[in-house]
A protein has these predicted regions:
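Activation segment of protein kinase catalytic domains, centered on the conserved DFG
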Residues: 8-21
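Protein kinase catalytic-loop region centered on the HRD/HxD motif
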Residues: 26-37
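Conserved end of the kinase activation segment
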Residues: 67-76
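Structural helix C-cap motif within protein kinase domains
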Residues: 91-95
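Conserved C-terminal C-lobe helix
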Residues: 115-128
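Terminal C-lobe "cap" of eukaryotic-type protein kinase domains
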Residues: 130-155
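Regulatory extensions appended to serine/threonine kinase catalytic cores
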Residues: 153-199
Length: 199
């Protein structure tokens, strides 16, 4: 019997289609089971290629929303945790210098994920907003992730498009596996929530 694997095991090695798939499947499971805790250590990678959220009532340090604790959580706080979870899976780093919501203030700038994944980076920033009412809902996350996952898988089916010559070391498509530890947690201002739709 193979040892169980979790999304924490692929942190920094996750491609864009897989990241959208994780968001799509986990947001749906959170809504279905009314679970208010999520982090990379309780999302199991199944043998059939899907992802399963394991039951948990205790959060890991660095993945709780600024307004949440072990007794006061709601959908908005779990959306924040899901954004922090996705950031960790893609970047192999924790938000707010590992402190999570405990280290976030209303004036804090939000971490920007990857220059070549602008839609996902924007959506994660929306999840990590300090004010709970400014975050997307689980349904909005699921709908956006479903659309973007379909786009990614269609692009894989059609094959790569021609890309312009890079203007700098941080332009274009750069594989996370080859750049672990290279990407800084840069900061970027955000704007009022507007659910992502494909242009």
């Amino acid at each position: 019997m193979e040892e169980k694997r979790y999304t924490s095991d692929i942190a920094g090695h996750c491609n864009e289609p897989t990241a959208w798939q994780i968001l799509k499947e986990v947001s749906e499971q959170l809504a279905e089971h009314k679970q208010l805790v999520v982090n990379p250590f309780i999302i199991e990678i199944c043998e059939d290629g899907h992802f399963s959220l394991l039951p948990s009532e205790t959060q890991v340090v660095g993945f709780d929303a600024p307004e949440a604790d072990n007794t006061h959580r709601n959908e908005a706080s779990v959306v924040w945790s899901l954004g922090a979870t996705l950031f960790h899976i893609v970047m192999a780093r924790q938000v707010m210098n590992g402190k999570g919501g405990a280290g976030q203030k209303e004036a804090s700038k939000l971490p920007y994920m990857r220059s070549e994944w602008p839609k996902m980076s924007e959506l994660v920033q929306q999840c990590l907003r300090y004010q709970p009412t400014q975050r997307p809902t689980l349904k909005q996350l699921h709908d956006s992730a479903t659309e973007q996952y379909s786009r990614c898988t269609e692009e894989v089916r059609r094959g790569p498009k021609f890309k312009k010559k890079l203007n700098s070391l941080t332009d274009g498509t750069i594989n996370a596996t080859n750049n672990m530890g290279f990407w800084p947690e840069t900061m970027h201002e955000t704007h009022p929530f507007n659910p992502i739709t494909e242009a």
